[in-house]
């Protein structure tokens, strides 16, 4: 993560990349900082030598980035709001899913992982980085320095790839529904694999973390063996892996799913069950698209800030650059608090869960309908009920003649005719139907509860 300009950290450059979500400090630009302390101002910036005394320049820059108390108080409130909403909101989401059997679906297990990642980043990363950025002083010791540089990349990786797993799962459920869905065990394996890959990606941040005690100042930073260019390259790779690549995958999958679900009605699809499942699937996909778009918007300004300040190092001397950084970092961290709000607004079952969680509030009323939303299922899926679906393929309906019991008429006992579109897979009293379908609406083992 790009470092925030402060009185002691104004020269960021490519060395000030920091941890992807977490290290505000300049200490990532420790070489430049030490050069400045030694009086080598020009070499620190890579600028021509000036006649101005380094101590005078240092004092001017320090004054430039000193914030008034009222501004620090406002930023503290803004960051505190993010932490409070993100931690408590995501913990409630986890409780809603794990405490109610009806909520334990494949998609929701990935939402638990997403909520855990977001709550962890908010609790262990946001305020610590804000304090470090404002005071340019590391108060939290060597062990937490390593954790601070390591964990944010891990958590953001887990968050974005949980969303990616949901997108792929939705794609498989809607585009190729007859294939078996992920089991609970397979889902846990996927989640475990996500965290293992996240740990591997973030491990260099832990390995190269350092504490430097300066006169009157303690710094936490990442010192790469080959210097700032290696650090810059690493974080470009991180941006690609935790932002560009997963967003590309989700963009493609949700585009295909959206075309399928909103591409128009299928002729003859008038069954109530079909419309119920279609509506439920649309709601879930719409909710997840909003979650993904929110994440992308929140993190984009921060990544732009990082790239621009790394390439154009003179931007780090702009008098408003610290405010730009604090704003972009706040927006990135705020992505952790929006998901519970989105779930509550767009999903009636999560809304019922939040009502139960806040039932102690005098203005929150939990109705009997809200209780039923979390405790009952709409129907129990079976092989037979799942075939009671909509088919895009032509199927053959075998009609059994009422006179099939008459031996004299056994020769015309049954005949094959094209399926009546008006039947749409729904029950019909005059005949029994047997069809093999390839439905884009239902899989053989999926109920409406999976989507609504």
From Swiss-Prot:
CDD domains reported in the protein's UniProt record: 7tmA_NKR_NK3R (cd16003)
Intrachain S-S bonds: 145-220
Transmembrane regions: 72-94, 105-126, 147-168, 189-209, 233-257, 287-308, 322-346
Gene: Tacr3
Recorded family membership: Belongs to the G-protein coupled receptor 1 family.
Keywords in alphabetical order: Cell membrane, Disulfide bond, G-protein coupled receptor, Glycoprotein, Lipoprotein, Membrane, Palmitate, Receptor, Transducer, Transmembrane, Transmembrane helix
Top-level taxon in the UniProt lineage: Eukaryota
UniProt-recorded name of the protein: Neuromedin-K receptor
